[in-house]
Amino acid sequence: MTVARPRRWGAVVVALACSLLSFVAGAGASTPKAFFGVASQAPLSDADFDRMATAQVGTLRLEIFWSGADPSAAPGDYDWSRTDELVGEAAARGIQVLPFVFSTPGWVAALDGHECADTCAAYAPRGPAALAAWRDFLDAAVERYGPGGEFWSLNPLTPELPIRAWQLWNEQNSPTFYKPKPDVRGYAKLLAAGHEAITAVDDQAEIVLGGMFGTPLGGRKPGIAAWNFLGKLYDRRGITKRFDGVAPHPYAARFSEALLQVERFREVMVEAGDGDADLWITELGWASAGVPDPLNRGPQGQADRLTQAFKYFLKKRTQLNIRSVSWYSWRDNPDSGAGLCTWCPYSGLVTADLTDKRSLKAFTRFTDGS
């Protein structure tokens, strides 16, 4: 069992005061703008960011590709160009960025003995040398995008909206994203190394667990049910000192089923004595079109489920310590193909050509956007 963790909201509130001290009138005067977010699945353009701004999107969850930004073992050879663009466009419109850091470079995977060349993304760092590379990269990322970071000094005309919360990995309970198979002990080491690196630069930064999908592979091994993974993670001594937030990805055909998943997360957290930890619902969504799938609910069904979910989580925001809810996804990406996720290509609030869907109208009822 663990003791209740101290809250670290104060510094975050101060950091966001200038840009995010707008509140959502339609959701009640106490709801911060950052509560309502979206996650990206398609490349984002200026037009995407402009539309997000008018829709009053508060948080943008996006991926920082470690493999893309750190392509070789040469010290300091970071390529921040794509992340710079995304962070800058978001900041210019007052949108808070919540990054999840994922995708192991081939040279780092090789340190752990993996021969995967260009398919190493999900081979999370495990050994001392690979974890040292992980720490170095996160240190550099916070130095660039955190408070007073290099990106802000290089772009003085961009409103400073530093990244204060960092999500470490993605769906680590699934073999799709954590190879060769999910490993609680291995993830705990990744988490501890990440926490050490990030807080050494920004001691008020918040660390969010990688989002966890309820039942990878339909509950079959080597996938681990999210609540079981979380419970085993809590069994690691001192682990609650390494993170501040838990991130469900409660995908289900019906919202009632998604809610049951969130409740199971909360049960595990409370049982571990960590009921004060925040919930960041970093992915939640349904599709409006595409191939037959339980999560394809059609245009109106998608909008109805968004309304149902956002209404509930808004109501329970304080009771459940919910920091934000990010809809997956912002824009359709039919070119991605069905792949591992048959419904994802049409999960956007807007179509591929940025035409509003009914679900965007539902979203803006909560944000007072247009």
Roles of regions detected by a PLM:
Residues 46, 50, 135-164, 182-303, ...:
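Noncatalytic carbohydrate-binding groove/subsite architecture in carbohydrate-active enzymes
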Residues 117, 123-125, 162-167, 172, ...:
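Aromatic-rich peripheral "rim/lid" segments of glycoside hydrolase catalytic domains that contact
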Residues 12-23:
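Bacterial N-terminal signal peptides
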Residues 55-220, 238-241:
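Substrate-binding cleft and catalytic face of glycoside hydrolase catalytic domains
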Residues 1-13:
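Bacterial N-terminal signal peptides that target proteins for export
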Residues 29-59, 63-65:
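Boundary/entry segment of secreted carbohydrate-active catalytic domains
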Residues 5, 65, 171, 212, ...:
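Flexible loop residues that form catalytic
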